[in-house]
Structures are given as C-alpha cells and as structure tokens.
C-alpha cells in the first residue's frame, strides 16, 4: 500500500510503499544524532520511497564521514527521512510523519546500536 509521508507544514511530501501488514522493520537509534531527534525509524527499500513535493526546500544534514544523508524540511525543521551510512541503498523514514501511524501505540520498539556503529564517539 502507498502512504503519504509529510513534514509538519506539509511542504515536503513523499509516497512510501509499505506492506499491507505495516512497516516490517522499525526501530529507535542511539547514535548521537538520532537520540537527539528521538524519532522512530521505519526501514524501507530504495524503490519504496518517492519524493513528490518539496525538493527545493528539503535540506541535507551530514556529519563525520558524510556518507549518511539526513533530510529535513527547511521551513518547519521536521526530519522526514535518511539514507543510512551502513546501507545507503535503503531509506529510514520518520514514521511519525505518516498520519495514520500512532507511534505512541507501538510497544517494545527495538533500539539499533548506532552509537557503536559510529566511527567517532562524542
């Protein structure tokens, strides 16, 4: 099924393809950036994400190795998606940006050990 992923102001919008049973892999990450964002990441394939609005206002944030790509809306500041360093062919999406997913209802969200995957520790 196709779901709409939108930032808070609605100026960045993407279509994400997820199975009928829902996002199969989701997690929190404890790397220095993700723990500060505090969001839940849904993992989808590279062919399951299509940006449909806001390409010009979408901003890129990179740090350390500059391999991972973290995207956010330059108007409202909401992080919408990323391309992780460990596998740049997949997308990590902010599942709170999909209106009909209740992130507060998710129980036992696993934690990815991104802190120990980083090359530099703060």
Regions found by a protein language model. Name each.
Residues 1-120:
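A short Gly-Trp-Pro
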